[in-house]
Amino acid sequence: MDDSTQAAEAVITTPTGARTVRFETGRLARQAAGAVVAHLGDTMVLSATTVSRSPKEQLDFFPLTVDVEERMYAAGRIPGSFFRREGRPSEDAILTCRLIDRPLRPSFAKGLRNEIQVVATVLALDPDTLYDVVAINAASASTMLAGLPFSGPIGATRVGYVDGDWIAFPTHSELERATFDMVVAGRVLEDGSDVAIMMVEAEATPGTVALVAGGAPAPTEEVVAAGLEAAKPAIRELCRAQSELAAGAAKPQREFPLFIDYHDDVLETLTAAVGEELAAALRIAGKAERETELERVRALAVEKVSGQFEGRDKEISPAYRALTKKLVRSRIVTDGVRIDGRSTTEIRELSAEVDYIPRVHGSALFERGETQILGVTTLAMLRMEQTVDTLNPDRTKRYMHNYNFPPYSTGETGRVGSPKRREIGHGALAERALLPVLPSREEFPYAIRQVSEALSSNGSTSMGSVCASTLSLLNAGVPLKAPVAGIAMGLIREGDAFVTLTDILGAEDAYGDMDFKVAGTQEFVTALQLDTKLDGIPASVLAGALQQARAARLTILEVMAEAIGGPDEMSAHAPRVISVKIPVDKIGEVIGPKGKMINQIQADSGAEITVEDDGTIYIGAADGPAAETARSAINAIANPQMPEVGERYLGTIVKITNFGAFVSLTPGKDGLLHVSKLKQLAGGKRVEKVEDVLSVGQKLQVEITEIDARGKISLAPGAESIDTVSAGS
């Protein structure tokens, strides 16, 4: 080790053995404000935190940027792109950026306007280890060393629910036996008494339903709440190690200017001028009417107070927002009444409709208040599944969920084009919520693309996407193991009091302290996501929110069941995909030399055929008869019924020799019509040249006369062929 290197270790005890996360600094990236290399086994992530010299005074937000660089050399691979180098970040990298950003952002001092960038680079990857939680810890540690106004450290761990135990930092192989997988980030309270939860990203696994059916405990709300508690010791140990490293290696904290959005005198003046009118406007239930009145009150506020604060006009808008936030929160905490008049546990009006769009394979429209989501399902052959070139060991995705959030969904103008990080994150959350209930490849051999169109937004379009997608998938005929619904929960904290809100509005998301999204079936949770603006939330509060969310989820599932109770018949416009299993040693026969046989079957049937290494063959066609024709041809080659003497076939002559003609009876099964048998086709005369009687490609009715010990088949012309040829002559 270099003399300048300092290190600290966090040792986390699990039921399957200890996990050691090692933090090192001083050897790499020395010009960064803070740089840390985090190790977990052979996985190695470098995080570098840098800060701009001067603030961006014109900004009204904190300019934090988080980037994750996946280096393919980390897994001993060359990128699969045309230029053979890394390009735009993968979806996994983008999702990891969000995992890092979410707990880091609220930990910086309010009012900071210096640009801060955190870059996490994956240098080495153990194929059985997930790097995302290592990157979160590395990012927190490097930021701790950078001399910034940062209230870290933040510890993050993944916990998997395996065989009834919560295991910290589970491996890929352990997660295959897990019923729930959860990433939890948090911080230790100043008095050291507890760990406050700051971020959660969790989901049931694709194998959850099968594992539960086999006797494994289901990930119910109680189990998930226990998982949050199980994550705390690991978070505490990771924070301890980061603090130990920072104690010896951190730069002294620099003085950074903090830009206050407004001063108290502006807020007090606004309260006196328009406080009562603003409170009345906030009691209007309808969003459109409420926002119209709020705009009027806002204009009135500017008119009344702008002359009193010359040169400080920029303070009026944030002060008005602060007053709005205060009134909204006060009414909820004091009266238990929300902006639109609902109680804290009430859900907005629900609507669900399927088969909304013609010709598509499946569609649904789901509405919750003013939030409106259109779900559309497309089915295709398995060869259309997505190929993924990332550090993730899964190289393909059969289920692809895309989420679109056009600007008109909020009544605004804006850029339309490639998805932003938020859209990718929302799509991934909805995808994870549905993965546990999707049928297996064997049960439903289709590639599935689900698109969620957020047509109107006023609170939790991501959870609306889960509901719309469930409806759309069922409408497309996908045999889901159970329907899934989702709900977004909010939180208001005033002092030591916490008020949990069911089905939050967009404004409640903006003015509240937490966005907690929970999706699941009637029986268990399939996905959840927590973001908070606080320094942390007690796990007991989250446990209560989980139970409140369950009651709402069951209500939504009832409404969805009224729209569609189970999988519909597949659309006439959807492809038909069937499968057939053949012996592995027959794969070559089905494909044929240079693909001759499989190409012939595809040409004859019009079907598309995909052959798997295990002998499973998927056949896709525009209709059922075409698929069945291809399956019959494949079975004739690989799973043939042995022909018997006396059976008759309408065969095709495939080859002529001087001793007879070879006739194809079924694909891969030929018989010989000897020249001596041809005199029956020539009026009893001896045939000198086979070509005088028969030609390649000619259809001929034949009968099996003999099958020798080696399986060679001898044929004779059928009576129909004798009559046909005689009539022709």
Curated annotation (Swiss-Prot):
Please name the PROSITE patterns in this protein's record: KH_TYPE_1 (PS50084), S1 (PS50126)
Against SUPFAM superfamilies, the record matches this protein to: Eukaryotic type KH-domain (KH-domain type I) (SSF54791), Nucleic acid-binding proteins (SSF50249), Polynucleotide phosphorylase/guanosine pentaphosphate synthase (PNPase/GPSI), domain 3 (SSF46915), Ribonuclease PH domain 2-like (SSF55666), Ribosomal protein S5 domain 2-like (SSF54211)
* UniProt cofactor(s): Mg(2+)
- For region Disordered, the annotated ranges are 399-419
Q: Where is the KH domain?
A: 575-634
User: Any one cellular component term from GO for this entry?
Assistant: cytosol
- This chain belongs to the protein called Polyribonucleotide nucleotidyltransferase
Name the source organism. Parafrankia sp. (strain EAN1pec)
